[in-house]
């Protein structure tokens, strides 16, 4: 239960942290952009960080598995068959999952098994997943912008000194 809660809270908290780091240091000239684009950019960068972290830790998990089991397993079969890759992909990267499954089904129907499918999978995850989270984060940012604009009172008072 705690793992499930943490897995759903980690991406928004990471986006929140990345957003504030980007705005504090004005990276990518983010302060000149509209609010929804700032949130979208933070979401895309957060996706890149999360995917890279997952793939690196999956590789470390493979190394531990090889050391403990004494088997010679390649990274591709280990990633697709023995890790939480598909579960996390279907939850967080739906567009990339559909693209990967579509590509694999087309290749299977054609009877082709080209080399480098793991690299193609990583490319699809990075491109499609980042675009998905860019637009999803942008949509959430636009909704938040509308919400915050609705909270304003409408009468713009001059700023008074509080002391």
Give the predicted meaning of each segment:
Residues 2-157, 162:
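Membrane-helix boundary/juxtamembrane interface motif
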